[in-house]
Amino acid sequence: MKKIKLEVYLLDGCDKCKKLKTTLDRLKIEYDAVPCEEYPNMCDNIESVTGVDMYPMVNLDGKIHYIAENYSDIGKTKVISEQITTLGMYSIDNIIDAIQNY
């Protein structure tokens, strides 16, 4: 597997966040955890970019994957800047698949 830059934005007490972390650890996929309680400004920025406040979210080499709140946002890519795009996903499993297939 090639080396990827993976940041995982997490909230304490979030079951989906725990599932993502546990799965990434089990698959031995390296990532940088970004606890929102410790880095609120970073998480506020991610929420602003995606338009959602559901966690977890991941930044996979500049593409922010998040659980879409609206069905119409699933699979929709939005270019924020030259370095950042967003992609609405259906579930944690979809995010994990995207990471594994990257």
Where are these regions (language model features)?
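Thioredoxin-like thiol-disulfide oxidoreductase module
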Residues: 34-54, 64
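Local sequence-structure signature of Cys/Sec-based thiol-disulfide redox active-site neighborhoods
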Residues: 1-32
